[in-house]
Each structure stands twice: as structure tokens, then as C-alpha cells.
Amino acid sequence: MRIQVINPNTSEAMTHKIGLAAQAIARPGTQILACSPDDGPLSIEGHFDEAIATLGVLEEIRKGREQQVDAHIIACFGDPGLLAAREYASAPVIGIAEAAFHMASLISTRFAVVTTLTRTRIIAEHLLQRYGLSELCTSVRCIDLPVLALEESGPELIECMAEQARRARDDEGAGAIVLGCGGMADLGRQLSEAIGLPVIDGVAAAVKLAESLVDLGLTTSKHGDLADPIGKPFKGRFAYLSR
């Protein structure tokens, strides 16, 4: 089985980290193909970044189709371009936020999210609403740290995340914590040990869900809005998409 893991930003260090985390959780025989776009933002921290990154995600999906991968994962917590990617791809496409939310709902009646910048809280809340899981999330908590700062993780970072997670646990009754950034993919075990709660990393959750969908022979339904894109002419830099 070959799973394409797309880091939608252009940080090579983060792509490497995400790829290692994905391969570590994958079962024997599953090959992880970690990649990122050639063009786009170095980190994704808002709607503008997501809009630009979506074009890169779709280009990587195109490459994955040519490589005939068995599944695609979008490894950014905003799930940028997820529905467009499902429309474009023939193999299953999983976003790490959606994967993490659903995984958390299976092991706890209430969960909280610990993410990076405060401005991304609303984006996470919008995703929870879209996926129908808002009522299960006690809060989206932020550590006010830029995404790229996660590349230099240490004890201070874990303690900062643990402080927010403990508040969600003690004040709100959260029974599980969702990591709100693909760049946190290597921090789940340390945080879980620090707070005594299950911690769900979306990259790991997405890999296991992708393996399960492939095993079950399931992929995106092409009935309705996720049917293949309607053929039409494209101009300029997108002319290659014409059909």
C-alpha cells in the first residue's frame, strides 16, 4: 500500500518530520510518500495562506494520481482543499483535522484542541461545525506560537501545551486532546505522558484511517458534489487542466 502524505506548506523540515511520524505509525508494508508543493507559503496560519496552499495541494494530488497511490492525506490542520481534492482524486483523501476529530470522538465524549496561533482558533471551530462535531469539543486552546517555531520543540513547548490541555481537562472535563497542527506530529506521546490523557495526532489518525479505507475497498463516492470535475477549457497557467 502506498499513501501520499501532502504537507501543504513548503517547509522541507516539516515535511520530513511529518513523513517520519506517518511512517512510524504505518503498518509493515505501507509505504509513505511525503511531499510538499514547490510553490506556496512556508507556513499556513490563516485563510489567505490556505487559499494559496490549496493550489499546491491539488498539484500534489495530480502527481499522486499519476503515481497511482492508494490514498492521499492532507497534513495541515485546516484541511486546505480537502473537498476539491476529493473531487479530483480517485483514491481516498483524508484531512488530518477531520481524522483527528473523529478519532477523538471514538474514545471520549468530550475533547479539546490545542493549536498554535489564536487567529487559527476560528478556523478550527469552523471545521468542527462543518464536520458536525462542535458539541463534542469543549474548547480550542492556543499556545500563541508560530507554526515554524514547532520545528525547535523542547521541554518549554511541551509544558506550554500541557498547561492548556490541563485547563481543558480540569475546567471543562475534556477526556482527550487533539493536536491542532501537522507540525505537532511528533509531540503526542510526550504530551500524553505529561497530562495523563489520550492525545490524538491527526497525521497518525489519518494514516490508520487511510489504511482501513483501502483495506475495505472504499473510496470517495462520485455521486453528487464530489463527482469528477466537469470537463471544460482552462486558461493560462491552468491550461493543462483543460479537458
In which residue ranges do the predicted regions lie?
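Short, flexible loop segments at boundaries between secondary-structure elements
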Residues: 145, 200-219
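Short, acidic/small-residue loops that bind anionic groups at enzyme active sites
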Residues: 86-108, 190-207
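Active-site rim beta-loop-alpha module in soluble metabolic enzymes
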Residues: 122-181, 187
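N-terminal beta1-alpha1 ligand-phosphate binding loop
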Residues: 2-25
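Short, well-structured alpha-helical segments in soluble
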Residues: 51-68, 159-173
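Short, glycine-/small-residue-rich phosphate/pyrophosphate-handling segment
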Residues: 13, 105-142, 156-159, 212-243
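Periplasmic-binding protein-like
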Residues: 5, 66-76, 173-181
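N-terminal beta-loop-helix "entrance" segment that forms/cooperates
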Residues: 33-58, 148-153
